[in-house]
A protein has these predicted regions:
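Membrane-embedded transmembrane alpha-helical bundles that form the catalytic cores
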Residues: 1-506
Length: 507
């Protein structure tokens, strides 16, 4: 019962809404907790004990950190964080670590071998672990008061719309609203289900249709080169964006039905003018978490302060800032890569963006001088278009390695990009051999155009749903029915289509 399945939004969600509304206000958070645990148990069964364990550790750590002495508070926080990280590291990374240590032992003929064990990963562990660590850190920094009711904390960590794919919430984002138990309002229901419908369009009409092309190109990578590698990278990037952002639409819409506002996870990332801006618009909640709990602490660490004091005396301000930035960014991008999975491709992906962003920072003063010398206005349309196109190249290259099954395959595909690059393959019928016909490709292109128009309005701070709700009843119903019609008629599901799992649910 994934978010995009009819059983979720036509059966499960309405049942929860009815049960929630019928319950007394003071226990509605308990109703949400009950259904959230039921939802989790459907996917993870006995692995729910890890969620229960993480919740208990988080609760006790928060309470002890808030009441402990100054010296003990830090020790308690460190123990709590490492208990949570320990579960995540063992479940997600122990096999990867053992494989690479064994490879090293084999290289030096040491004769030792670690057992390689693969664990079934509990649903959402990468998401709720970060939320739990953020909660404990916020209590330690006295940004929030510790939650006294463990059930309310459990709901914050397990709320069913966010447990599978996020967004990664801070306690201050949702906890108070979840605990209030406000009445369900018709406007919230309408806005919520409109958002769910929009997410379904992106997921089942576009992303699931592109899945066929992506699988064909990446599974048969050895047979493709030149412009077809570009098609592979672009197709996967669009598939990933449409699926992940579509899922976020469903998630945010589901929460909105209860009057709960979740943080946005995407903000039109493909209008970004550089890689840094892209990551401020893409998977926003993950970037915010890394910035708050890794980047800022490292920036204020003893190592960084020592470097700054040394650099002020012996180097230029430029070198001081670049090295300080590298010190803070490096652990962020290592963690970003490994958070996605135990794979060298993911680690390379993180290091790729570390290098790209550092190059952008280093070149920024020179670019500004160049623009001033050539009298290029920063807001000139042609200049911004060039910067956006440059960022697209960076994004598509990164996603090529991100999607490749191994780093070696990613390297092979990247090298193949420069072999026999014939743009003619885009219209000579080659695209029609990838699993989609002309009609299917046409559906994708028209749907992308619709999404692009809506994203343009959102970039202009226009509330599209609000505009629709202000229209007369016949117009509103025309929009509702059109959205339902598009999803039902053009969705890539049923006979002839392969069911596509949610990509980020695997992280």
């Amino acid at each position: 019962m994934a978010y995009h399945e009819s059983m979720y939004f036509l059966v499960f969600l309405p049942v929860v809404l009815i049960g929630y509304q019928l319950a007394p206000k003071r226990v509605r958070f308990g109703v949400l907790l009950f259904f959230s645990y039921c939802f989790y148990f459907l996917f993870s069964h006995r692995l729910i004990v890890y969620l229960l364990g993480a919740t208990t550790i988080t609760y006790l750590t928060g309470r002890l950190v808030a009441t402990g002495e100054k010296k003990r508070r830090k020790t308690i926080l460190i123990v709590g964080v490492w208990l949570l990280l320990g579960m995540l590291l063992v479940m997600k990374y122990s096999g990867f670590f053992a494989e690479n240590v064994n490879a090293l032992f084999g290289t030096i003929n040491l004769g030792l071998r670690l057992p390689v064990r693969r664990f079934l990963l509990p649903l959402g562990i990468s998401f709720y672990t970060l939320s739990a660590i953020g909660y404990m850190a916020d209590v330690y920094w006295k940004k929030i008061e510790p939650e006294k009711n463990i059930a309310k904390l459990a709901l914050f960590l397990s709320f069913f719309p966010i447990i599978m794919e996020g967004p990664i919430c801070m306690y201050s984002d949702t906890a108070e609203t979840l605990a209030k138990g406000e009445d369900i309002r018709s406007e919230n229901l309408i806005r919520g289900y409109m958002r769910i419908g929009w997410g379904l369009l992106k997921k089942v009409v576009i992303a699931d249709r592109l899945y066929v092309v992506v699988q064909t190109l990446f599974d048969g990578y050895a047979s493709y080169h030149g412009v077809m590698i570009v098609v592979a990278a672009v197709s996967y990037t669009v598939q990933l964006y449409m699926e992940f952002s579509g899922c976020m639409d469903i998630v945010i819409g589901s929460a909105e039905c209860f009057g709960v506002t979740l943080p946005e996870n995407f903000a039109q990332p493909f209008v970004s003018k550089n890689a840094s801006e892209f990551w401020r618009r893409w998977h926003i909640s993950l970037g915010r978490w890394f910035k708050t709990y890794i980047f800022y602490p490292v920036s204020m660490s003893k190592l960084t302060r020592k470097w700054n004091r040394f650099a002020k005396k012996h180097t230029s301000k430029y070198i001081m800032l670049m090295v300080a930035s590298a010190i803070a960014f490096f652990p962020v991008w290592v963690c970003n890569g490994l958070w996605h999975g135990a794979n060298w491709s993911y680690l390379f992906y993180g290091m790729y963006y570390f290098v790209v962003i550092m190059i952008e920072l280093m070149l920024e003063p020179a670019v500004k001088k160049l623009c001033a010398a050539w009298k290029i206005a920063e807001d000139a349309a042609w200049w911004n278009v060039l910067r956006i196109l440059k960022t697209w190249v960076i994004i598509f290259t990164g996603e090529l390695f991100f999607r490749a099954d191994t780093l070696g395959i990613g390297m092979h595909m990247f090298r193949s990009l420069f072999h026999d690059f014939s743009i003619q393959k885009l219209w000579d019928g080659t695209l029609l051999t990838l699993g989609l016909g002309r009609v299917e490709i046409g559906i994708i292109l028209v749907s992308l155009l619709i999404v692009g128009v809506v994203n343009h309005f959102r970039e202009q701070q226009i509330d599209v749903r609000g505009v629709i709700l202000q229209k007369r009843l016949p117009v509103r119903w025309l929009v509702y029915l059109a959205l339902i019609f598009v999803v039902l008629i053009f969705g890539a599901y049923g006979p002839g289509y392969q069911e596509v799992d949610l990509i980020y649910a695997g992280f």
